[in-house]
Structures are given as C-alpha cells and as structure tokens.
Amino acid sequence: IYFNGGGLMAGSGSEPRYAGESMARKGIIAITANYREGIFGFFSHPQLSKETAYKGSGNYGFMDQVAAIQWVKTHIADFGGDPERITIAGESAGSMSVSALMASPLCQGLIAQAIGSSGSVMGFNAVATLKEAETAGVEIAKALGCKTIKQLRAMPAEELMKRANVRNVPKYCIDGYFFTEQPTQTYADGKQLHIPLLIGGNN
C-alpha cells in the first residue's frame, strides 16, 4: 500500500509516478490509498475533540491511512493477496506517514513490513500536543471568520480549502488515539511495530 507525498497538504495516489505497473508485472499487488490532507486531514479544535469518544481531534489523514490498511487486510485475499504480508510504503510525507503508522497502536497486527523514502515523523519538531493543535485550530477558524465547527462545516469544501490556504506541513498531534505519546518516545522504548523496515532517500 503506497501513500503519496506532498507535505500532508497536497498530492494523491492517482499521480502517474505512483502507478504500480512495474510491480504488478512481478506479481506484486500494488495499491495506492488517498487520505485527507490539509485542513481536512489535520485540523484540531476543542469542539471536534468534544465530539469524539477519546476526546481528541486532528489526525484524520493518518486515520484514513489506517482505515485503508484495515480494508486491505480484510479484502486483499479476494484479489489473490496475502493479508499477512501487507507492506506499507511512501515517499516524503508518505514516508513520514509510514513511520507514524509504525508508532501508532492502531496498526498493531496490520502490517508485515514497511518502506520509507525521504521522510520520517521524527525528522521534524516534536509532535504538537492536543492543546497546541486545538489552539492553532481555533486561530485558523477565527481567521476564516468562524467561531464554531458548525460554521466551518457549512462552508463549501472548495472555499474552505482555498481560504484555509495551508502552505506548511499541518499540525498532527498527540490526540490520545492515533498517537498516545511522542513517536520519538515510542521508538526509544521499543514500542513501535517490530517489522522489517527499508529506509532511504530519493530525488
């Protein structure tokens, strides 16, 4: 399963460079999975956190990736694949996602191996706390003239995307669900997925 790059704010699995024909010719089942990006994928707000059972918000793009892996785990045998041999891979933000998924408790038992190229969740600043991400989300909402999540949801998606104008890697956070602690701590304590990992860089 290949996750696209693009700074968690742009890109998709349908880009020609991610086509899997060469792998398919070798008998590999190649899958790309889209995930929410920018304000749709990584936006925290106290009102959103209040809606969830785990009282957190913000890592929707990562949770989309988990859902894609779960779907493949359930259905890949119907396509001739082995649910016990799922490999996740990505470049840039996709590679960062790979290392994030390996640190998430949601991925236990889902993945057999991983490939990351030119990116790691540990290659940036510390992951934002939920409070920090919520505060940033409130400021974004204010800049859009919205005091409530209801107002944001009423805005057409295209308008919201343009007006939010996300131009930097958006704030993912320790939401208590996808991330329960800093990924650096998870890896330091050896609590990440213990699976074969191939890492490197590309151009």
Briefly describe each language-model feature range:
Residues 74, 108, 113, 117-203:
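Substrate-access "cap/lid" subdomains that shape
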Residues 26-31, 82-86, 107-113, 193-196:
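Loop/turn elements at helix/coil->beta-strand transitions in domains of secreted/extracellular proteins
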Residues 95-107:
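Short glycine-enriched nucleophile-adjacent loop
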Residues 88-91, 115-117:
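Short beta-strand immediately N-terminal to the catalytic nucleophile in serine-hydrolase-like folds
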